[in-house]
C-alpha cells in the first residue's frame, strides 16, 4: 500500500488530479484504476481490486491517509478458445539478453538477428530494460517521493529514449502501435508518480509497478523487430504468468504449479514459435506486481527454462564467459569451458561475477545447462554450467588439481570468541549465533577449533561493531568469570575461496594452495572447508588479498612456476643474462613449466618497466624509446606489485655497494635476491649475519653462486658439504680469471708487464689493471668462502699480497701505470726463475684455513704436477679439504671469468629458485 499523512486541505489537490474511478492503465490483459478511497487514521490494508484512492471522513481530524494498491488483472480465457497443449522439452531454447545487449537500436537489431538465426524449434527470449533505464525509473520514484518536480521531465526523457529507438527500428504500423502503448503507459506513470509526489512515500508494490515498465517496452520493441525479420513472435508480460511468494528481505520463491497453469493459459491464446518475455517482473498470488529483485532477469530466464523443461538457457552478456578469477585483479585469468552447478553456486556466493545462486536452482531441477556467452564476440564459445564440469584448460590439458576458479569477498571483519570455558558446554555456538542473528548480521564464514576452545567467523565490516557489542553483552558474565577470555574482532579482512567440484577426490589441493600462499609470504588468519570439499576458504588481510589471488591463480593456472624478474644493471653481465633468458624462455616454459617474466630492467639513469613482461628480443631499442628516469624504489615496487605474478626476484648484476645495501629490505618484503655482486657478502660482518639469518627464517631466497668463480658450483658444493655433516678444513683456489690468465702466460720469454698489457687488451682485466693486481677482489671471494664455512671474519682480517709495486699505487691513470710497470719486471722475473729452478710455478691463490680460523691471499709456488699448475687460459680452480675428503680433496675447475659464464651462473641460480618454488626437477 501507499500511505502518507496529509491534511484535509491537501485533498483538493488529489481530487483535482484524479477523478472518481479514472482508468490510468489500459493495456492488454492488465488493468489499473484510481478511485477515491476513505481517509482514516489507521493505515489501510492493500486493496485487491485495483489502484484506488477513496475519500471519506471517519472522524474529525487534521491528518488523513491515502491508501492505494496495484493489482494485475489475470487474463481469463474465452470459453470459445480451444485449449492448446503447451509443448515442453528440449525443443525449447531460452535466451536472456541484459540491458547492455538491448542498449540501443543497433544492439536490438543484433539481438533479433541472433534469435532468428537460432534454429531451435521453439524459442523464449527474456529481455531486460534498455541500458540505464531501470536506474532512471528508480530515480523517478526517488524524485517523486522527495517532492522534486523534475520527475516529470525525467519521465519525459525516458519516453523520448524509447521513442527515438522505436523511430529507428519500426515501420509505420508497428511504430504507431508501439507509440500508442508507450503514451498510455506514460500517462499512467505520471498519475502514479503524482500520487507518490503528494504522499511523499512509495511502497514496494508501487515501486515495482513503476520500475517494471522498462522491461515492458524493451520486450515490445524486440518482438516487433523479430516479426519484421520474419519470425513468428509474440511478446509476454510475465506478470501474467510468473507467480512468486515473498521469502524474506529482498527474496522471492517461485510458485511453479501456479506459474505452469498460467503459462498454459497464456500459450493457448498466444501460440507462436518465439516468445519475447519481460525479465525481472512477476506477480504475487494476490496479482500484485512485483519484481524478482537482484539479477531478476537471469532468474526469469532460469524459471522459464524450468517451466518449459528447455534444452538450454543462454545468458548473453558483455564478457566471454566465466573467468577463473576476476580479470580486473588477475590479468591472466582464463575463460572456463565448463562449470558444474555447485561450482557456479560456490563462486557466485563468494563474489564472482557468474550468476546469482538462486538463478541456478530452477535449472538444476531438470538438469538444464546454462551457457554464458558474449553478444559482442559470437566466436567465443562461452562457459557452460551443467551437472558435471570438465577439468580442462583452454589448450585441453587436464588440470592436475581440478580447481576451477577463485573468488574473493572484501571489507570483512573476523570475530573470534575464545575461552577454555567453551569446551564441552552445549549451546555455546547457539548462543553466539543467536546474538549475531538478533542484530541482523550476516555470517559469511565459520571456523571452529576441534578442541572447542574457540569459534571465529567473518561478518561484513559494517556490522562488526554491532556484533561485537551484542556478543560482549550476551557473554558478560562468562567474560567476567574468565570462562571466556575474549571477544576479539579483526577488521580489514578479505576472504579468498578456491572452488572445484573434484577437489575432494584429488589429494594435495590444500597443500598446493597453502604452499602457494606461503611462498608469496602471505599469512592466513582462518580456514574453512566443508566435507564436500567444493571450496576451501581462507581469511587473510585485505592488503594481501589481490596478491594472494594472483599467487594461487598463478600456481594452478599459469605455468607450474611463474616468476617476475627485475634486472638491475644491464651492463656486460646483465645484458648477456637477458640474451640467455630470451634464448631459453620458450624451452623452459614448454619443457619445465617455468615462466620467467622480466618485468623491469634498470640502469643507473633509465629503466624500462612492463605490466606483462618485456619483449627480450628488442629490450635495448624499447628502453631507448620508452625508458623512464631510473628510481630503484619505484622499480622494485613495480616488479613486486604491479602484475599478476606472486613470486618476485631481483637480480643485481652490478658491483654497487649501494644496491647491495637494499638486499635485507627486499628479503623482508618477500622478494628473492640473486646476484654476482660480492659487496653484500664481503661487507661488514654484522650486516652479512643479519642477511643470512633473515634468509633462514623466511620463505625468501638469497643466491650468490656467481660471486666467487662465475658459473662454477663452488657455493652450492660448499653448502652441500656442510649440510650433509662434513667439516671444512681448508679451501684453496685460484679465484681470479684475470690473474689465472696472467700467470698461465707468464713464461721465460715474456716479461710480466707485457703479459699484463696483453691481458688488458684481451679484455680480461678491469679498465685499471691495478684493481685485479691488488688482490682485493680475490680477498672478497676468500671472505665469502670463509663466512660460508662458518668463520666470522672481516675483510680486514684477510692479509693480501698486492702485485702492484708500492711506487705505482698512487699513480693517477691506468695508462701511466702500464707505462711504468716494466721498471719492476725484474722482481717478478726473479720470483718466476726461483720457482722454475725448483720445478714449480707461480700461482695467485686465496686460502681459507678453517682449522686456524683465518684466510690469506698470496702469490704461491706449486709443483708442476699439482692441479693448480695444469691450468690454461683464464680457468679457475678450487680444492675442498674436509674431514671426509682429507687425503684427496675434490677439485672444481673451469672458466672463472667472462660475461657468458658469469651470466650463466646467475641463470643457474634463477633456475634453482624456480625449483625451490615448485618447478619440476
From Swiss-Prot:
Binding locations of Na(+): 705, 708, 710, 712
Pathway: Amino-acid biosynthesis; L-lysine biosynthesis via DAP pathway; (S)-tetrahydrodipicolinate from L-aspartate: step 1/4; Amino-acid biosynthesis; L-methionine biosynthesis via de novo pathway; L-homoserine from L-aspartate: step 1/3; Amino-acid biosynthesis; L-methionine biosynthesis via de novo pathway; L-homoserine from L-aspartate: step 3/3; Amino-acid biosynthesis; L-threonine biosynthesis; L-threonine from L-aspartate: step 1/5
GO cellular component: chloroplast
Feature: transit peptide: 1-87
Region annotation Interface: where it falls in the sequence: 340-567
Active site annotation, chain numbering: 781
Segments of this protein annotated with the region Homoserine dehydrogenase: 568-921
Compartmental location: Plastid, Chloroplast
Binding, NAD(+): 573, 654, 898
Residue ranges occupied by any ACT domain in the UniProt entry: 417-489, 498-575
Annotated spans, Aspartokinase: 88-339
One example GO MF annotation: NAD+ binding
The organism's place on the tree of life at top rank: Eukaryota
Keywords: Amino-acid biosynthesis, ATP-binding, Chloroplast, Kinase, Lysine biosynthesis, Metal-binding, Methionine biosynthesis, Multifunctional enzyme, NAD, NADP, Nucleotide-binding, Oxidoreductase, Plastid, Repeat, Sodium, Threonine biosynthesis, Transferase, Transit peptide
Catalytic activity: L-homoserine + NADP(+) = L-aspartate 4-semialdehyde + NADPH + H(+); L-homoserine + NAD(+) = L-aspartate 4-semialdehyde + NADH + H(+); L-aspartate + ATP = 4-phospho-L-aspartate + ADP
Binding site for NADPH: 573, 654, 678, 898
PROSITE patterns: ACT, ASPARTOKINASE, HOMOSER_DHGENASE
EC code: 2.7.2.4, 1.1.1.3
Keyword set includes Transmembrane helix: no
Residues the entry annotates as binding L-homoserine: 766, 777
Role of this protein: Bifunctional aspartate kinase and homoserine dehydrogenase that catalyzes the first and the third steps toward the synthesis of lysine, methionine and threonine from aspartate.
Protein name: Bifunctional aspartokinase/homoserine dehydrogenase, chloroplastic
Organism: Daucus carota (Wild carrot)
Amino acid at each position: 500500500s501507499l500511505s502518507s499523512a496529509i491534511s484535509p486541505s491537501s485533498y483538493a489537490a488529489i481530487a483535482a488530479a484524479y477523478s472518481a474511478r479514472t482508468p490510468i492503465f489500459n493495456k492488454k490483459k492488465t488493468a489499473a484504476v484510481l478511485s477515491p478511497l476513505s481517509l482514516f487514521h489507521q493505515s489501510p490494508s492493500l486493496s485487491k481490486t485495483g489502484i484506488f484512492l477513496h475519500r471519506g471522513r471517519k472522524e474529525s481530524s487534521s491528518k488523513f491517509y491515502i491508501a492505494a494498491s496495484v493489482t494485475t488483472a489475470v487474463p481469463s480465457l474465452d470459453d470459445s478458445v480451444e485449449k492448446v497443449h503447451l509443448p515442453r522439452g528440449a525443443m525449447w531454447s531460452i535466451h536472456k539478453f541484459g540491458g547492455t545487449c538491448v542498449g540501443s537500436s543497433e544492439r536490438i537489431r543484433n539481438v533479433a538477428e541472433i534469435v532468428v538465426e537460432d534454429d531451435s524449434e521453439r524459442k523464449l527470449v527474456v529481455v531486460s530494460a534498455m541500458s540505464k533505464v531501470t536506474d532512471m525509473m528508480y530515480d523517478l520514484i526517488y524524485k517523486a517521493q522527495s517532492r522534486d518536480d523534475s520527475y516529470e521531465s525525467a519521465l519525459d526523457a525516458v519516453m523520448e529514449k524509447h521513442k527515438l529507438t522505436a523511430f529507428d527500428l519500426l515501420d509505420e504500423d508497428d511504430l504507431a502501435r508501439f507509440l500508442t502503448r508507450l503514451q498510455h503507459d506514460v500517462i499512467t506513470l505520471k498519475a502514479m508518480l503524482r500520487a507518490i509526489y503528494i504522499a511523499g512515500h512509495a511502497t514496494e508494490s508501487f515501486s515495482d509497478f513503476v520500475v517494471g515498465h522498462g522491461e515492458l517496452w524493451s520486450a515490445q520493441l524486440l518482438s516487433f523487430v523479430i516479426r519484421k525479420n520474419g519470425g513468428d513472435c509474440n511478446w509476454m508480460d510475465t506478470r501474467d504468468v510468473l507467480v512468486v511468494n515473498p521469502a524474506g528481505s529482498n527474496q522471492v520463491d517461485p510458485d511453479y504449479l501456479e506459474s505452469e497453469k498460467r503459462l498454459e493459459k497464456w500459450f493457448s491464446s498466444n501460440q507462436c514459435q518465439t516468445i519475447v518475455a519481460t525479465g525481472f517482473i512477476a506477480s504475487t498470488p494476490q496479482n500484485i506486481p512485483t519484481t524478482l529483485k537482484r539479477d531478476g532477469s537471469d532468474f526469469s530466464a532460469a524459471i522459464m527454462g524450468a517451466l518449459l523443461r528447455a534444452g538450454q538457457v543462454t545468458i548473453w552478456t558483455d564478457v566471454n564467459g566465466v573467468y577463473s578469477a576476476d580479470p580486473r585483479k588477475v590479468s591472466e585469468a582464463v575463460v572456463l569451458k565448463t562449470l558444474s552447478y555447485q561450482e557456479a553456486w560456490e563462486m557466485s556466493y563468494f563474489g564472482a561475477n557468474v550468476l546469482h545462486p538462486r538463478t541456478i536452482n530452477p535449472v538444476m531441477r531438470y538438469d538444464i545447462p546454462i551457457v554464458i556467452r558474449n553478444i559482442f564476440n559470437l566466436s567465443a564459445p562461452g562457459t557452460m554450467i551443467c551437472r558435471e564440469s570438465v577439468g580442462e584448460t583452454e589448450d585441453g590439458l587436464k588440470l592436475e588439481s581440478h580447481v576451477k576458479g577463485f573468488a574473493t569477498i572484501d571489507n570483512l571483519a573476523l570475530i573470534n570468541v575464545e575461552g577454555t570455558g567453551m569446551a564441552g558446554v552445549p549451546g555455546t555456538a547457539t548462543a553466539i549465533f543467536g546474538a549475531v542473528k538478533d542484530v541482523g548480521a550476516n555470517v559469511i564464514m565459520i571456523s571452529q577449533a576441534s578442541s572447542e576452545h574457540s569459534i571465529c567467523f567473518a561478518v561484513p565490516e559494517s556490522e562488526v561493531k554491532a556484533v561485537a557489542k551484542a556478543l560482549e553483552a550476551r557473554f558478560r558474565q562468562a567474560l567476567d568469570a574468565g570462562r571466556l577470555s575474549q571477544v576479539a574482532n579483526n577488521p580489514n579482512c578479505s576472504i579468498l575461496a578456491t572452488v572445484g567440484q573434484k577437489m575432494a577426490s584429488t589429494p594435495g589441493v590444500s597443500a598446493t594452495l597453502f604452499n602457494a600462499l606461503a611462498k608469496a609470504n602471505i599469512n592466513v588468519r582462518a580456514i574453512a572447508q566443508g566435507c564436500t570439499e567444493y571450496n576451501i576458504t581462507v581469511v587473510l588481510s585485505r592488503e594481501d588479498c589481490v596478491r594472494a589471488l594472483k599467487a594461487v591463480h598463478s600456481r594452478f593456472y599459469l605455468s607450474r612456476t611463474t616468476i617476475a624478474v627485475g634486472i638491475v644493471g644491464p651492463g656486460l653481465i646483465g645484458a648477456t643474462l637477458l640474451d640467455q633468458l630470451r634464448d631459453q624462455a620458450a624451452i623452459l616454459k614448454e619443457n619445465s613449466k617455468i615462466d620467467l617474466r622480466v618485468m623491469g630492467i634498470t640502469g643507473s639513469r633509465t629503466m624500462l618497466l612492463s605490466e606483462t613482461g618485456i619483449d627480450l628480443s628488442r629490450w635495448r631499442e624499447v628502453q631507448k624509446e620508452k625508458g623512464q628516469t631510473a628510481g630503484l624504489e619505484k622499480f622494485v615496487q613495480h616488479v613486486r606489485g604491479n602484475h599478476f605474478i606472486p613470486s618476485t626476484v631481483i637480480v643485481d648484476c652490478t658491483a654497487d655497494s649501494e644496491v647491495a645495501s637494499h638486499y635485507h629490505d627486499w628479503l623482508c618484503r618477500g622478494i628473492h635476491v640473486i646476484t654476482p655482486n660480492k659487496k653484500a657478502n664481503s661487507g661488514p660482518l654484522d650486516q652479512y649475519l643479519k642477511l643470512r639469518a633473515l634468509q633462514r627464517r623466511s620463505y625468501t631466497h638469497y643466491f650468490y653462486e656467481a660471486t666467487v668463480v662465475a658459473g662454477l658450483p663452488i657455493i652450492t658444493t660448499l653448502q652441500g658439504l656442510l649440510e650433509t655433516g662434513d667439516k671444512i678444513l681448508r679451501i684453496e683456489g685460484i679465484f681470479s680469471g684475470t690473474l689465472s690468465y696472467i700467470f698461465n702466460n707468464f713464461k721465460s720469454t715474456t716479461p710480466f708487464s707485457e703479459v699484463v698489457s696483453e691481458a688488458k687488451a684481451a679484455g680480461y682485466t678491469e679498465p685499471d689493471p691495478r684493481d685485479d693486481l691488488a688482490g682485493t677482489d680475490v680477498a672478497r671471494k676468500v671472505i665469502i668462502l670463509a663466512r660460508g664455512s662458518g668463520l666470522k671474519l672481516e675483510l680486514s682480517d684477510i692479509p693480501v699480497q698486492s702485485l702492484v709495486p708500492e711506487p705505482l699505487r698512487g699513480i693517477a691513470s691506468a695508462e701511466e701505470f702500464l707505462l711504468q710497470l716494466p721498471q719492476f719486471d725484474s722482481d717478478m722475473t726473479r720470483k718466476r726463475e726461483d720457482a722454475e729452478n725448483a720445478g714449480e710455478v707461480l700461482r695467485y691463490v686465496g686460502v681459507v684455513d678453517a682449522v686456524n680460523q683465518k684466510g690469506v691471499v698470496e702469490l704461491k709456488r706449486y709443483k708442476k704436477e699439482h692441479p693448480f699448475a695444469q691450468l690454461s687460459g683464464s680457468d679457475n680452480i678450487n680444492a675442498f679439504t674436509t674431514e671426509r675428503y682429507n687425503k684427496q680433496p675434490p677439485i672444481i675447475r673451469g672458466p672463472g671469468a667472462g660475461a657468458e659464464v658469469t651470466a650463466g651462473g646467475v641463470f643457474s641460480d634463477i633456475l634453482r629458485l624456480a625449483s625451490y618454488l615448485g618447478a619440476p626437477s
